[in-house]
Amino acid sequence: MLKRAFELKGYHVVEAEDGQQALDMARRYHPNLIVVDLNMPVLDGLETIKHFRKLEGEGDHTPIVTITAYDVYGMEEAAKENGTNAYLTKPLDLDELDRALKGLGFIV
């Protein structure tokens, strides 16, 4: 559903199966936006965000949208401390996704 929503907006989407693959793909493709699920195998979403931000170093940062079905107390703060720019919960509301993307400067 999420991939299709982005494709309908004209975005090219590349999917990763796990956090490590997401990092490898980010190095290779240099995306304009990263969408991370907190519940991923190999490296979870928080670890993936943390490693990605370390790879980026100083300067401009690729926007990261974090999505989760496990919205437990403190999780949003932890995601933001690790470098996420927008935090959304499942079930995903596509209007909420649009607002988050607009807030990050994307045309939706």
Model-derived regions: residue spans:
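Charged docking surfaces used in two-component/phosphorelay signaling
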Residues: 3-8
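Short hydrophobic/Thr-rich beta-strand motif most characteristic of the beta2 strand and flanking loop
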Residues: 10-17, 25
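Acidic catalytic/metal-coordinating carboxylates
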Residues: 17-21, 44-51
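Active-site beta3 strand of CheY-like receiver
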Residues: 29-35
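Receiver (REC) domain active-site loop signature in two-component systems and cognate sites
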Residues: 40
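Alpha4 helix (beta4-alpha4-beta5 surface) of REC/receiver domains from two-component response regulators
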Residues: 47, 71-88, 99
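C-terminal output helix
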Residues: 92-101
